[in-house]
């Protein structure tokens, strides 16, 4: 009986590997290239920056999963081969696909320290043609990135080379010896894999649930290695796509029964300006050595808050967090409680949304990146007006709004939200050429940077200065009215500040990384008419400029300023309220692999960072 089992085992289990041994090796190699590369890079980075600065990648579990996936691919190819000889074409196609995936994985890790995940597909979905071309010119056409296509060529070469290699091996050694070797190795791999899967299933039966993917901080880090397997990445992406649709419907449900009203003396106009990718350490108002806030620095009644951070380093999650009345550290998800524009509209405000990025006719309503508030069950409950076009530069967006402003803001009180492009994606495309103020020659003291890297920093600072002029223009539009203007960015960005890196990366790479990607400007302007009518609010604002704050609590600050009474208002979360909890933990929830980070624990009391490195 044991002999019969052994024969059947060899026939059913080992036959695919014996028929396609070299293909099995190539598939496994393609799956393991990102694992080997990221493990090596993480170890080197840990040695350079210290053991606590980088989350070491756990890849043992991933390797076992990748071996199993390789076996599945080969088995499918073998079965197709037995049926109609189509199997070899299937395997070649799988190898080509895995080559592309390997290239993408290495590109994402090198440029953003990220893996393939649902956020990548969200980013692609929110990106328009203009931003796509900017992304390609900024990241794809870099000399350093030319190494990735070479991987595909090497793999194709190995495909041909190893067919010859295995043919030589077969001719040199007896067939029974080769079969015995393959049988032993394959048996060992399969037994280890099945044992691992059994233990994994017993200990972590709930790991693949939707609730687990949300509550990533409760997962034992010993099991995070599983999430790095390609199979899990595909599964988790599909799961999150499904969850997104449910989340949007839950968000719409939360807007059905809103109870809100204005109590006391409200304000005629509340203007919110949302910037993009603004690292406050590049603002001269915050001590930067380049005059990037030339225009705002000349405005009176300007309150500059110096300890405000974004709740996450991505646009989609940031919007979800600061629009929702549910905070990140609460027991509720963003979709469980109403979004503040809907509460303002219910209270009687005319709510305007004027965006240079999120435009209804160019957004997918199922995308949490940009379209969820354009869903038919949500939009009309949130906004009285939304624009239909976007522009190359933010100045054009504001110029167009000035033409329709009297009509759009005819009713009062108004809540006006302007969403700018700011320094988004490629900063060299964010300002007109006649607004060039800084050049690479101005960064002669940054000897650690190449000319191209200096040019990027100059473009980022030019985009910051242009953004400053746009904010000043918006303030000028309302300065004669009873108005409070609040400016903040959705998140920060890196511009070769403490390393050669552009854009954003993971949140587990130390204090400097958090400072660049999460430290944002938060500025409040009060008109003369406002200061005369609301002296108590002025006093509260003046006393709160040094308080620690995270933008997920923005709705409660707005309710306080607008004198809106609603059950979702929490005084301890309002930045200017006397009951404000300044000791609140500012928790940043990263992606599935990173877990959560306590910003204040990592960065301490240091709200400044030094730009430059040696």
Predicted stretch roles:
Residues 253-259, 399-405, 442-486, 509, ...:
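A long, amphipathic alpha-helix that forms part
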Residues 55, 221, 327-331, 385-389, ...:
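Active-site rim elements
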Residues 353-355, 415-422, 461-464, 484-489, ...:
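Short beta-strand segments
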Residues 14-26, 89, 160, 164-167, ...:
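Membrane-interface soluble catalytic domains
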């Amino acid at each position: 009986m044991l002999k019969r089992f052994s024969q059947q085992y060899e026939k059913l289990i080992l036959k695919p590997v014996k028929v396609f041994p070299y293909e099995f090796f190539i598939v496994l190699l393609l799956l393991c290239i990102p694992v080997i590369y990221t493990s090596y890079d993480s170890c080197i980075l840990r040695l350079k920056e210290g053991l606590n600065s980088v989350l070491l990648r756990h890849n043992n579990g991933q390797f076992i999963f990748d071996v199993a996936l390789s076996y599945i691919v080969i088995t499918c190819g073998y079965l197709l081969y037995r049926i109609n000889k189509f199997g070899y074409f299937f395997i070649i196609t799988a190898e080509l696909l895995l080559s592309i995936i390997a290239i993408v994985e290495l590109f994402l890790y090198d440029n953003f320290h990220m893996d393939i995940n649902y956020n990548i597909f969200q980013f692609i979905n929110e990106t328009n043609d203009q931003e796509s071309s900017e992304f390609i010119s900024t990241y794809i056409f870099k000399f350093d990135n030319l190494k990735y296509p070479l991987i595909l060529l090497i793999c194709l070469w190995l495909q041909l080379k190893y067919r010859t290699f295995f043919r030589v091996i077969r001719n040199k050694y007896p067939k029974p010896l080769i079969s015995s070797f393959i049988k032993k190795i394959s048996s060992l791999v399969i037994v280890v894999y099945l044992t691992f899967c059994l233990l994994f299933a017993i200990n972590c039966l709930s790991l693949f649930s939707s609730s687990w993917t949300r509550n990533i901080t409760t997962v034992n880090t010993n099991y995070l290695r599983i999430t790095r397997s390609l199979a899990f990445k595909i599964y988790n992406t599909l799961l999150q796509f499904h969850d997104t649709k449910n989340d949007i419907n839950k968000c719409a449900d939360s807007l059905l029964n809103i109870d809100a009203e204005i109590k006391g003396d409200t304000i005629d106009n509340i203007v919110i300006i949302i910037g993009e990718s603004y690292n406050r350490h590049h603002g001269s108002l915050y001590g930067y050595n380049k005059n990037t806030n030339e225009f705002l620095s000349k405005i009176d009644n300007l309150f500059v808050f110096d300890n405000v951070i974004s709740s996450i380093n991505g646009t989609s999650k940031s919007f979800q967090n600061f629009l929702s009345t549910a905070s990140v550290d609460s027991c509720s998800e963003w979709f469980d409680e109403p979004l503040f524009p809907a509460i303002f509209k219910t209270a009687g405000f005319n709510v305007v949304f004027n965006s240079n990025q999120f435009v209804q006719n160019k957004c997918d309503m199922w995308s949490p990146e940009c379209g969820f508030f354009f869903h038919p069950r949500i939009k009309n409950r949130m906004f009285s007006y939304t624009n239909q076009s976007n522009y190359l530069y933010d100045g054009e967006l504001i110029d167009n709004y000035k033409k329709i402003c009297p009509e759009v803001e005819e009713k009062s009180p108004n809540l006006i939200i302007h969403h700018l492009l700011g320094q988004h994606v490629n900063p060299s495309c964010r300002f007109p050429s006649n607004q060039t103020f800084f050049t690479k020659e101005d960064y002669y003291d940054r000897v650690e940077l190449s000319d191209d890297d200096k040019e990027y920093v100059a473009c980022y600072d030019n985009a910051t200065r242009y953004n400053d002029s746009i904010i000043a223009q918006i303030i000028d539009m309302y300065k004669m009215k009873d108005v409070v203007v609040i400016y903040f960015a959705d998140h920060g960005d890196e511009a070769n500040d403490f390393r050669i890196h552009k854009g954003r990366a993971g949140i587990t790479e130390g204090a400097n990384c958090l400072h660049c990607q999460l430290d944002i400007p938060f500025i409040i302007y009060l008109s003369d008419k406002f200061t005369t009518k609301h002296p108590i609010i002025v006093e509260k604002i003046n006393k709160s400029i040094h308080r620690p704050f995270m933008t997920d609590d923005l709705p409660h600050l707005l309710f306080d300023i607008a004198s809106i009474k609603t059950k979702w208002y929490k005084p301890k979360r309002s930045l200017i309220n006397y009951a404000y909890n300044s000791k609140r933990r500012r928790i940043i929830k990263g992606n599935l692999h990173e877990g959560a980070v306590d910003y204040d624990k990592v960065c301490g009391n240091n709200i400044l960072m030094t730009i430059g490195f040696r």
